[in-house]
A protein has these predicted regions:
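Double-stranded beta-helix
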Residues: 1, 124, 163-166
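Non-heme Fe(II)/2-oxoglutarate
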Residues: 1-80
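Short beta-strand segments enriched in hydrophobic/aromatic residues
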Residues: 89-91, 116, 165
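Conserved metal-binding segment of the jelly-roll/cupin
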Residues: 92, 131-148
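A short beta-strand-loop-beta hairpin characteristic of the jelly-roll/cupin
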Residues: 95-100, 107-109, 115-134
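Short beta-strand His + acidic residue motifs that chelate non-heme Fe in jelly-roll/DSBH
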Residues: 100-102, 146-154
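A short hydrophobic beta-strand segment most commonly corresponding to one strand
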Residues: 112-114, 155-166
Length: 166
């Protein structure tokens, strides 16, 4: 599945609501984002807030996903059931860094990344395809295909919502 980009996924009012709903979450830091270093570098982390996991909501912000995102998902793709939803925060750093390639799961399924802000960070696939972080952009892809994230050097951080689903 070649990544499919949907810009302006929400109208302005809906996007402002979604952005505000996810701007004040408490994130848990994940050290060693690159997965390679044994020593934690000052830039080598990201933070995550898990919203949905193992067939159940694990955070109250699931209501926003259920009420705002899922109706649009039905229009944009063949969504049947959610596997995982998490919000990622990649912090600003003076130096631009690409994390190693990874897959979200070992089996083919659908995924989407929704950008909450615009910055010079991006998602890159092994074939060189690069999807820029542009606020209110959703892109659909197969997360079993190797891809990687980046930090940002031109914003406070890179914020996105990651969906894995069938």
């Amino acid at each position: 599945m070649k990544p499919e980009i949907i810009d302006n996924f929400f109208d302005h009012r809906e996007f402002d609501y979604v952005k505000n709903a996810f701007s004040n979450l408490e994130y848990s830091p994940i050290p060693g984002a690159s997965g390679e270093e044994t020593e934690i570098l000052h830039w080598n982390y990201y933070s995550v807030k898990t919203i949905y996991l193992n067939d159940e909501p694990v955070d109250e912000s699931w209501g926003v996903i259920r009420d705002i995102f899922l109706p649009k998902f039905h229009l944009a793709c063949q969504y049947k059931t959610m596997l995982r939803v998490k919000v990622n925060f990649y912090p600003y750093c003076e130096t631009f860094h690409k994390h190693p390639y990874h897959t979200d799961q070992d089996f083919s399924h659908q995924g989407a990344i929704f950008a909450l802000n615009t910055c010079n960070g991006f998602t890159e696939f092994e074939d060189g395809t690069k999807i820029d972080s542009v606020e209110n952009r959703l892109f659909l892809f197969d997360p079993s295909v190797k891809h990687r994230s980046t930090n940002t050097t031109d914003a406070m951080g890179r914020f996105n919502i990651n969906f894995n689903f069938f």
